[in-house]
Amino acid sequence: MISVKNISKTFNTPTGKVEVLKNVNLEVEDGDVFGVVGFSGAGKSTLIRCLNGLEKVDSGTIIVGENEITKLDRKQLRNARKKIGMIFQQFNLFDSKTVYENIAFPLEISGYKKENIRERV
């Protein structure tokens, strides 16, 4: 489950402040498939980066599963991210690996057991 309540995010630029997210609200239930669509510069990537704590919001709350992302310390956030899947806009795959191996790789280096990796992939 993902719950986003009134989040806002502003960036400082050489020409002034740019408000990229303003009072965004969103609910995604377990099992739902959800996409974020919009024009270039609309804030899609910023929203996703806020959901997993790569960007800090200026205000509002984000809950993913049982974790309030906006209140986690670094260690807690690192552990919470292990249960959050994200596909970056630009990413690289290892040409020498199969699809399965590419998906399993980050789980392996995070210390997951082989049987858990098999289940997640």
Task: Map each language-model feature to its residues.
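ABC ATPase NBD coupling module
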Residues: T15, I69-G85, K114
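Conserved coupling/switch loops of ABC nucleotide-binding domains, chiefly the family-specific signature
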Residues: D58-T61, N116
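Short helical segment in ABC ATPase nucleotide-binding domains corresponding to the A-loop/adjacent helical element
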Residues: Y100-E108, R118
